[in-house]
Amino acid sequence: QLQLSSPVCMGILNITPDSFSDGAELARSDRSEFRFDRDKVLFKAAQMVRDGALILDVGGESTRPGASPVPVDEELDRTIPVLEILRAEFDILLSIDTSTPEVMSAALAAGAGLVNDVRALTRAGAKQIVAKAQAAPAVCLMHMQGQPVSMQETFSYDSVVDEVFSFLKHRIADTA
């Protein structure tokens, strides 16, 4: 069970060939095939755990500015095998970084105990997946203005702190 009485460190494993944060260190793609490097994933995860991570977060769709959406099957192929490997190797809270209900469902079945959603469970079916999960997962609701492909074009706030606070307050009320 996730305890938030003190700060918790989350290690991020981006299983994407176009990640903005790790330069696609853990995954490669050519025109016909996507693959992740199992040894690199396990090495990086072990390093994060040694460094104090209490959660390992696995993402298969980049949300960097300008990123294109990833088909559901591709996101599943990127994330579920990694979650299964991590579950077999580590006794740690696993998180799925997704906004896609089908990926949430498969990830929870594969051992994830936290849903980390940059779209704050706004996609159709997302709230229901979390609500109906056999073991109630923790949820991390995040804020994103617009969509990755266009977020830099429509970026505008009158009061960023007030608007993000209000958005998250409403999302919490709606998902409770």
Question: Where do the language-model regions lie?
Answer:
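Conserved anion-binding
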Residues: 15-22, 63-64, 110, 118-176
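Glycine-rich, proline-tolerant flexible connector loops at the mouths of alpha/beta enzymes
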Residues: 19-26, 54-81
